[in-house]
Design a protein with these regions (language model features):
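Hot-dog-fold acyl-thioester-processing enzymes
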Residues: 1-58, 117-147
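HotDog/MaoC-like acyl-thioester-processing domains
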Residues: 3-5, 68-72, 80-147
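Short, well-ordered turn and helix-capping elements at secondary-structure junctions
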Residues: 11-13, 60-65, 97
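Hydrophobic beta-strand-centered segment that forms part of the acyl-chain substrate-binding groove
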Residues: 36-87, 105-107
Length: 147
């Protein structure tokens, strides 16, 4: 399952060169990921209510064309790898005016990997055991060929 999340670039997200500051792409990814979980029917708040959190293990972003203040972009994401202890998302940032995202060249691409830990002691847990319904939803949404 892919999700397209629209983002309007705000002035405060840009740097002295007038383009989106590089670290803000990671915030866009996080915003899209939060909406993805909600779309799966499992918002972050549900994890937190169970005493679980999902920290970033690894994140990367490759930048292409600059995005500027006032631009409308779309962050497209998909789950691309899943293990009982780890989930991987891939992201593409497109021009928000683009109609056919399958043919469009992304402004940026990225990837993040996340685990699941207990909030109280930061010990890792198996998603498959601790939150099997989330694991199954990720599994059903998995797109390993999404690059």
């Amino acid at each position: 399952m892919r999700l397209n999340v629209p983002i309007s670039v705000r002035y405060g997200e840009t740097d002295m060169m007038g383009v989106v500051y590089h670290a803000n792409y990671i915030l866009y990814f996080e915003d899209a990921r939060e909406k993805y979980l909600a779309k799966l029917g499992f918002p972050y708040a549900d994890l937190e209510a169970r005493g679980l959190i999902s920290p970033v293990l690894h994140v990367e972003c490759d930048y292409g064309e600059s995005v500027r203040y006032g631009d409308k972009v779309v962050v497209q994401l998909a789950v691309t790898a899943l293990k009982p202890t780890k989930v991987q998302f891939r992201y593409k940032v497109f021009d928000g005016e683009e109609i056919d995202l399958d043919e469009a060249k992304p402004f940026a691409t990225g990837m993040s990997e996340h685990c699941l830990i207990r909030r109280d002691d930061f010990k890792p847990v198996s998603m498959k055991k601790a939150v099997p319904e989330l694991y199954e939803r990720y599994k059903a949404a998995l797109e390993p060929d999404y690059q």
